[in-house]
Amino acid sequence: MSNASVRLATPEDAADISRILLEAFTVIREHYNAEAFAVVTPKSEIIESRFTEGPMWVAEIDGRVVGTVSLTTEPEGLYMRSMAVSPTAQKLGIGRLLLDALHEHAVGTGLTRIFLYTLPFQSGARAMYEKHGYRWVRDTTADEWYGVPGLEMEKFVGKENVA
């Protein structure tokens, strides 16, 4: 996979990020209600506005954006959101590359906790997160997130913990 790389995203990547999120979540659309699906597949204008909230990364293969992830700082720690890999690029190590970049950045912030939310039916995503040191924290209720139950996961990072 020597032709795959990860870099910090720029506002010019907003349309590609929106496209990747739509591609990745459309294949599991039936698990979301309309409001939740709109939240996980924001339009490029929403993506552009998020650049003030924290860093975003894109993964590329041969110059084409195939994955994305972003990070915001919250009272509870660093919140990982919008992790997605195009269905055509899954199982190629793109998720690992994105997590590596995110973890490297996280260590530099001095904050130690990264947390995320995923859905129970996304067993592949959960397995990838667990492989990279994330652990289940709690189940979330449908009342907490747009009518869709999920689960919270976390990882503690520091110079000695980065994989």
Describe each PLM feature range.
Residues V58, R64-T72, Y79-A84:
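Conserved beta-strand in the GNAT
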Residues S18-I47:
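Conserved GNAT-fold acetyl-CoA-binding loop/helix
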Residues S5-R19:
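A short beta-loop-alpha structural element at the N-terminal edge
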Residues V85, K91-E104, A127, K131:
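Conserved acetyl-CoA-binding loop-helix of GNAT-fold acetyltransferases
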Residues A9, M83-V85, T118:
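Hydrophobic adenine-recognition pocket in adenosine-nucleotide-binding enzymes
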Residues T73, S86-L92, P120-F121:
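Active-site acidic-Proline motif in GNAT/NAT acetyltransferases
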Residues E48, T112-A163:
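C-terminal "cap" of GNAT-fold acetyltransferases
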